[in-house]
Amino acid sequence: MTLEQLIPLIIMAFALGMDAFSVSLGMGMVTLKLRQILYIGMTIGIFHIIMPFIGMVLGRFLSERYGDVANFAGAILLIGLGFYIVYSSILEGEETRTAPIGISLFVFAFGVSIDSFSVGLSLGIYGAETIITILLFGLISMLLAWMGLLLGSHAKNILGTYGEIVGGIILVGFGLYLLFPI
């Protein structure tokens, strides 16, 4: 994989991880032990590996069957997801969050990683390198979740909704790039 291929994946991983960062930032304002912070971040990272992997496998299948239509659909999916993230971030704003434990942690991790399924679907259609992609998504999301939890425990409302909006805008940009390559 070339650096030219790796850089967009890293940027996309940061865009996806901004959702986990923003939510973790708010959650970090709840008193958490370091072990809880580590566990929450690792769970989010694992889900950011599993969800895009499933999406990429499905995306490759669709690409082999439907070719150009699948490419167009993948780009539209990224654009739609990006707009949805921006819209829902503005509409919902900040909400009170509590630290997830047990099953609620898995539901939480699933919720913040569902967008990575859609991105994985798009990347599968375009034939992105699976192992590198999912490991980048997982690692960066885990690190951003840890950062959000730690920063949230020290300061309030650093990024909040704006972090999610930036992530959504980046996804729209990548969708447009896939539709209209430079």
Curated annotation (Swiss-Prot):
GO terms for molecular function: manganese ion transmembrane transporter activity. HAMAP family: MntP_pump. This is Putative manganese efflux pump MntP. Disulfide bonds: none annotated. Probably functions as a manganese efflux pump. The chain crosses the membrane at residues 6-26, 37-57, 72-92, 101-121, 131-151, 162-182. It comes from the Bacteria. GO terms for cellular component: plasma membrane. Keywords: Cell membrane, Ion transport, Manganese, Membrane, Transmembrane, Transmembrane helix, Transport. It is found in: Cell membrane. InterPro entries: Mntp/YtaF, Put_MntP. Belongs to the MntP (TC 9.B.29) family. The gene is mntP. It is a multi-pass membrane protein.
